């Protein structure tokens, strides 16, 4: 019974979402919605006045996104020499050889970085005891099995210095990767440093750092290239030997693994936990070495491939992106808009047959797939609903312009340009 109730609730929720969403053509031409694609798609494309109507829709949309009721009145424009000098000094744009201003696309780069960060996983792996003394073993989580591009990898080690013996001595800490090679295939390359080869084992210097031994603190050792090499070879474990030759004479020591809890025996012969030992163990464990890995899937990974939206070429009727560029010079707006030179007012148009509704890659694919499942089977209230061709990916746009007070404004506008279209 609870399962049936849950299904009914989800069904009703989807129906409410669809009923509350505007359908193409439900908005008046005079409105300036936040979605320029929706406004342009409802306008006639073939009539004699179609182009002016579309340009007017774009104008209203730009003013709306800049929170302006009308275009600024630039009666006394700033001299071009002063304008170009200010732009150079403030680093808000670049001036080309032809005198045109190219705005710095900081927001576009930030959007790309944010998208990249969303695809990046961060994995922290704590060290285990290695097979030999002063060696550490790191086993990279299975979470990283699909990750093949290393953005950053670091080994963190804690250097402990006794309070009574703090000198100004500097010590050198080295990390060596222990490697196993098949018999007769030992080829370390130019960057390898062999130290005490024994049979099939060899060592490669991973990282080296000179640190101050005056205080107890963490030290970071970059190992990105080594982890990248491991992933390229299909491996997931790293064995590291730690060397610090001057540590003993300076009184410093590296915390490689937490000490095991000591057991004390009471008068009755029973074992009891030593409170001091427990605190010491907890402190040691808090300084346990770890590997921090930031990695992502490669561009050609099958899980990263998603269906790209179609570009309208006049040959297909299926939902696609229609390119539409409005030059600010052509519409007489280049006197108050400094940069860019125009606006890519792309919009979505085309049919959405049932077999492509809710395609992967669409931000609306969950709801559209559920609704389409019931619609195709004639279930009420979805039987008469139709899929719509809507933007599925938008990108931001930066603008540099004058306001009514001749001030230069730079504004970053989110979701301004349609990049891809899909069926809802």
Curated annotation (Swiss-Prot):
- State a single Gene Ontology molecular function: hormone activity
Q: Give the propeptide positions.
A: 21-308
Glycosylated position list: 165
Q: What Pfam family is a match for this entry?
A: TGF_beta
Q: Which PROSITE patterns match?
A: TGF_BETA_1 (PS00250), TGF_BETA_2 (PS51362)
User: Which residue windows are coiled coil?
Assistant: none
Got any disulfides in this one, which pairs?
312-320, 319-389, 348-421, 352-423
Family stated for the protein in its record: Belongs to the TGF-beta family.
Q: What does this protein do?
A: Inhibins/activins are involved in regulating a number of diverse functions such as hypothalamic and pituitary hormone secretion, gonadal hormone secretion, germ cell development and maturation, erythroid differentiation, insulin secretion, nerve cell survival, embryonic axial development or bone growth, depending on their subunit composition.
Name the chain's protein. Answer: Inhibin beta A chain
Please tell me the species this chain comes from. Answer: Rattus norvegicus
Q: What is the lineage of its organism?
A: Eukaryota, Metazoa, Chordata, Craniata, Vertebrata
The gene it comes from is Inhba
């Amino acid at each position: 019974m609870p399962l049936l109730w849950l299904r009914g609730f989800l069904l009703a929720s989807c129906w409410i979402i669809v009923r509350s969403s505007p359908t193409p053509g439900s908005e008046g031409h005079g409105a300036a919605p936040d979605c320029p694609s929706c406004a342009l798609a409802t306008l006639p494309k073939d009539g004699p006045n179609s182009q002016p109507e579309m340009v007017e829709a774009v104008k209203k949309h730009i003013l709306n996104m800049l929170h302006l009721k009308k275009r600024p009145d630039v009666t006394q424009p700033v001299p071009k020499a002063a304008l170009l000098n200010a732009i150079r000094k403030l680093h808000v744009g670049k001036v080309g050889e032809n005198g045109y201003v190219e705005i710095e696309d900081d927001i576009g780069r930030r959007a790309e970085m944010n998208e990249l960060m969303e695809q990046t996983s961060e994995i922290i792996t704590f060290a285990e005891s290695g097979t030999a003394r002063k060696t550490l073993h790191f086993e990279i989580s299975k979470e990283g099995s699909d990750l093949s591009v290393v953005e950053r990898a670091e080994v963190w080690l804690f250097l402990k210095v006794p309070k009574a013996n703090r000198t100004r001595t500097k010590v050198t800490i080295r990390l060596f990767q222990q490697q196993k090679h098949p018999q007769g295939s030992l080829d370390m390359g130019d960057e390898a440093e062999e130290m005490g080869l024994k049979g099939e084992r060899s060592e490669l210097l991973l990282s080296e750092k000179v640190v101050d031994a005056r205080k107890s603190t963490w030290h970071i050792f970059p190992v990105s290239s080594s982890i990248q090499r491991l992933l390229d070879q299909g491996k997931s474990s790293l064995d590291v030997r730690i060397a610090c030759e001057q540590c003993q004479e300076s009184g410093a020591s590296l915390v490689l693994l937490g000490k095991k809890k000591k057991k004390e025996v009471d008068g009755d012969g029973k074992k009891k936990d030593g409170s001091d030992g427990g605190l010491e163990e907890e402190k040691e464990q808090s300084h346990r070495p770890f590997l921090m890995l930031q990695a992502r899937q490669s561009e050609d990974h099958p899980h990263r491939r998603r269906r790209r939206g179609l570009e309208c070429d006049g040959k297909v009727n299926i939902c696609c992106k229609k390119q539409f560029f409005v030059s600010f010079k052509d519409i007489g707006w280049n006197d108050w808009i400094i940069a860019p030179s125009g606006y890519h007012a792309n919009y979505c148009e085309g049919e959405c047959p049932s077999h492509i509704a809710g395609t992967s890659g669409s931000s609306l694919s969950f709801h559209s797939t559920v609704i389409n499942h019931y619609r195709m089977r004639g279930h009420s209230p979805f039987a008469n609903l139709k899929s719509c061709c809507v933007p599925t990916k938008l990108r931001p746009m930066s603008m540099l312009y004058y306001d009514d007070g001749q001030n230069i404004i730079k504004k970053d506008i989110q979701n301004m340009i349609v990049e891809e279209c899909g069926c809802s």
